[in-house]
């Protein structure tokens, strides 16, 4: 991987994404890279860039001249190779339209072969010599400026400026009568310096071009499971400030098979990713609409119905246990087994505030009697369940859990007369606590992927709640290929 490709792989954690076929004009997820994050990326970039270009071959250099009384002289420098490069200092800077990264005070060591020959006309003979040389380049500065623009839901990468400047070169010859030819070979300093500059600049240019092509081949969505993806199209140009860069992403759940984006959600305000003290490298803001789009998708896909036929207190699923609660049920169906059918009547609604993350769930609870091979519905109770949530970051996923706060009931219909709902409350509470909540938590704890670039993982993440959104503030660690999850 060359320098330009390394740069964007490391700098833009949200480059994992490309446009999908449909795009919302609203953004529901924002990714902010702070100055600490930029510095981390810069340091990683420098190390990766050096490793990617070393050894670097420089084109051979030839020089011919004529000297009175000696005749024609030919000097060739070949196998010129940069084998070591050290960066004294570097910085990354954000401009109005792009990113600049500069490495200064750079030194590099090169090896080369030299060959010298000349022919004389008096007497007509040819003299030659050869050897090796060590070259040290000092005071080199390397700069790269990249433009970032939104392009049909993706990001367009362009090279604004690229350069390399060599301040000084020292050449030490070995082999042959090297002491005799040292001065002549020193005349190659300017040419060697120019070749080093142009070769490194060419590598940078090729790298940016390769990466721009590479971005177009990346996946269009992040898969969540077999039924859902995350729409991760960019909704605007990156927002560049003095010490941060922010990417605005659609972020809503989509239906995987049809690539259908749920468009019934609206962002209430412009997201401001705020991490206290800007001490974390990365801030990811997720609007509550993202959670509600997931709820709506799974509701529409009919993944929200449960038949309860086993519970910890199994005797509750027999009419004998209900004879004092609903006498008419026991009278009509004595000692009959039962099951409970729970289905959501509308998508759950998630609400986020500074003090609270919660969800309201509307469900229907149908009481069924099992008579021989028949399932006989006898009553339906409407439930309004209120739960509180706890969020946590697991790897690069945002997951959590829910606990029951309270619930209310109303009778929707009954084939066994009127019901005293207050007598049913302990049973319904038990069912919700032992069946509904654990089922929900089994799915919630898996979470969904946050927009993190391939090869990186969140570290020491914190979650901050604000009005209608949550923000994940985190440092970032880079994983080598042996540590990276296979699905990335």
Swiss-Prot record:
Signal peptide: 1-24
Sugar attachment sites: 79, 109, 231, 242, 341
GO MF terms, alphabetically ordered: lipopolysaccharide binding
SUPFAM superfamilies: Bactericidal permeability-increasing protein, BPI
Gene Ontology biological process terms from the UniProt entry: reactive oxygen species biosynthetic process; regulation of gene expression
Pfam families: LBP_BPI_CETP, LBP_BPI_CETP_C
Gene Ontology CC: extracellular space; plant-type vacuole
Record's keyword terms, sorted: Glycoprotein, Signal
Protein name as annotated: Putative BPI/LBP family protein At1g04970
Organism of derivation: Arabidopsis thaliana (Mouse-ear cress)
């Amino acid at each position: 991987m060359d320098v330009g490709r390394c740069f964007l792989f490391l700098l833009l954690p949200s480059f994992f994404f490309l446009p999908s076929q449909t795009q919302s004009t609203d953004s529901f997820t924002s990714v902010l890279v702070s100055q600490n994050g930029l510095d981390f990326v810069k340091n990683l970039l420098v190390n990766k860039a050096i490793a990617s270009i070393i050894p670097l071959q420089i084109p051979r250099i030839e020089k011919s001249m004529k000297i009175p009384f000696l005749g024609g002289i030919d000097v060739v420098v070949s196998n010129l190779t940069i084998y070591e490069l050290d960066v004294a200092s570097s910085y990354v800077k954000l401009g109005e339209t792009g990113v600049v990264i500069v490495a200064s005070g750079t030194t590099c060591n090169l090896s080369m072969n030299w060959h010298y020959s000349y022919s004389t006309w008096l007497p007509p003979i040819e003299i030659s010599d050869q050897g090796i040389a060590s070259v040290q380049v000092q005071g080199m500065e390397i700069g790269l400026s990249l433009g970032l623009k939104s392009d049909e839901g993706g990001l367009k990468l362009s090279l604004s400026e690229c350069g390399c400047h060599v301040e000084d070169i020292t050449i030490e010859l070995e082999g042959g009568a090297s002491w005799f030819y040292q001065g002549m070979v020193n005349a190659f300093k300017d040419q060697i310096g120019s070749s080093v500059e142009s070769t490194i600049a060419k590598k940078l240019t090729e790298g940016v071009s390769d990466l721009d092509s590479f971005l177009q081949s990346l996946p269009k969505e992040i898969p969540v499971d077999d039924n859902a993806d995350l729409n991760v199209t960019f909704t605007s140009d990156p927002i560049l400030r003095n010490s941060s860069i922010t990417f605005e992403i659609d972020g809503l759940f989509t239906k995987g098979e049809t690539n259908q984006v749920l468009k019934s959600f609206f962002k209430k305000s412009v997201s401001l990713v705020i991490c206290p003290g800007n001490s974390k490298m990365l801030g990811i803001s997720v609007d509550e609409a993202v959670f509600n789009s997931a709820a709506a998708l799974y509701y529409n896909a009919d993944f929200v119905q449960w038949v309860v036929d086993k519970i910890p207190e199994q005797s509750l699923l027999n009419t004998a246990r209900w004879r004092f609660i609903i006498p008419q049920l026991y009278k009509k169906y004595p000692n009959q087994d039962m099951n409970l059918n729970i289905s959501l009547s509308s998508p759950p609604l998630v609400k986020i505030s500074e003090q609270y993350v919660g969800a309201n769930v509307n469900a229907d609870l149908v009481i069924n009697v099992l008579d021989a091979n028949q399932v006989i519905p006898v009553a339906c109770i409407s439930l309004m369940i209120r739960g509180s949530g706890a969020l946590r970051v697991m790897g690069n996923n945002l997951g959590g859990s829910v606990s029951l706060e309270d619930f209310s009931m109303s009778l929707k219909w009954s084939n066994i007369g009127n019901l005293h709902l207050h007598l049913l409350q302990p049973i319904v509470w038990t069912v919700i606590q032992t069946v509904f909540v654990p089922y929900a938590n089994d799915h919630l704890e898996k979470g969904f992927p946050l927009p993190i670039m391939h090869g990186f993982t969140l570290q020491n993440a914190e979650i901050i709640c604000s009005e209608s959104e949550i923000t994940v503030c985190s440092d970032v660690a880079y994983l080598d290929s042996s540590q990276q999850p296979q699905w990335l």
